[in-house]
Regions:
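Short, structured coil/loop segments at alpha-helix boundaries
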Residues: 4-8, 57, 75
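General N-terminal targeting signals
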Residues: 44, 67-69
């Protein structure tokens, strides 16, 4: 079964990924609950919201998140 809560270890892995884009960690918002389909988007306040996809295994989602984060950063 896929956990619906995002663990500290998973948050750490997401932040390691966002560090590759040299993003300030203060600009990253990661809700503690995963959501169906997940999402990665820039919020009106300039922060980037990263919602883990509850429907995918975490490693698979994280691999696909890299491209989406890049798209959001470049937008």
């Amino acid at each position: 079964p896929i956990p619906k809560d995002v663990t500290f270890a998973q948050i750490t892995r997401i932040l390691v990924l966002t560090d590759e884009f040299e993003l300030d960690r203060e600009l990253i918002e990661i809700p503690l609950a995963a959501s169906s389909h997940g999402k990665i988007r820039k919020l009106p306040n300039g922060k980037i919201e990263i919602v883990v996809d509850a429907d995918l295994p975490f490693d698979e989602w994280l691999a696909s998140a890299r491209q989406r984060i890049q798209q959001v950063v470049e937008a």
